[in-house]
Regions:
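Glycine-rich loop(s) and the adjacent beta-strand/alpha-helix scaffold that form part
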Residues: 100-110
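Conserved beta-strand-loop-beta-strand element in the redox core of flavoprotein oxidoreductases
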Residues: 50-68
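Conserved FAD/dinucleotide-binding core of flavoprotein oxidoreductases
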Residues: 12-13, 17-20, 25-30, 64-67, ...
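Short hydrophobic core segments
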Residues: 48, 68-79, 153
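Glycine-rich beta-alpha-beta "Rossmann" dinucleotide-binding loop(s) and their flanking helix/strand
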Residues: 85-100
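Active-site-adjacent segment of FAD-dependent monooxygenases/related oxidoreductases
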Residues: 1-39, 43-52
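Flavin (primarily FAD) binding-site architecture
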Residues: 75-89, 107, 164
């Protein structure tokens, strides 16, 4: 990807500057790391219940009770990470002030005009209390050829914390 651009409200480019950068997808990164890792050392679906760091590595206990020793523990266990809670118990999640909706569209399902707008561009559009970004990522199976990739889009919307419950549930909380 060679350019960064900002769009006018009508969709036409407002500014464009050369800014080469590489984009990928979590799926492609995951598959590359997974291929490099031996299957017998990967514990998918085995809940981590305890770990301790020592001079010679990390001892890990899994849900079934088995204990293994590793040189490195990668805590890729999500937003409410057990690993992070154990290492940094004082760090608590806090609302960032916005919500985000994300989606992907196969290039093959996007119109030519849309593809011309986004191909080779990391694109932003600013709106009232929100913005959208869009860029091309590899296809579902890691394809990088034109026509087989996907358009990744994320819509960020600034929402006061007091309105978050109603937004996320469709319900309003009335406090008397």
């Amino acid at each position: 990807m060679n350019y960064r651009q900002y769009l006018h409200p009508g969709g036409e480019p407002a500014t464009r500057q050369r800014m080469p950068q590489l984009m990928t997808s979590w799926g492609l990164l995951y598959r590359a790391l997974r291929r490099a890792f031996p299957p017998e050392r990967y514990y998918e679906g085995s809940p981590l219940t305890e770990f301790s760091c020592g001079e010679f590595g990390v001892s890990v206990r899994f849900g079934a009770g088995d204990v293994q020793r590793f040189d490195l523990l990668v805590g890729a266990d999500g937003a409410r990470s057990f690993v992070r809670q154990q290492l940094l118990p004082e760090v608590k999640p806090r609302y960032a002030g916005y919500v985000a909706w994300r989606g992907v569209v196969p290039e093959s399902e996007a119109g030519r005009a849309l593809l011309r707008t986004f191909d080779d561009h990391f694109t932003f559009q600013q709106m009232h209390h929100s913005h959208i970004l869009c860029y091309v990522i590899p296809g579902a199976a890691g394809e990088r050829e034109r026509g087989k990739r996907r358009l990744n889009w994320v819509w960020y919307w600034n929402v006061p914390e007091s309105e978050l419950f109603a937004l996320m549930t469709g319900m309003r909380r009335e406090i008397a």
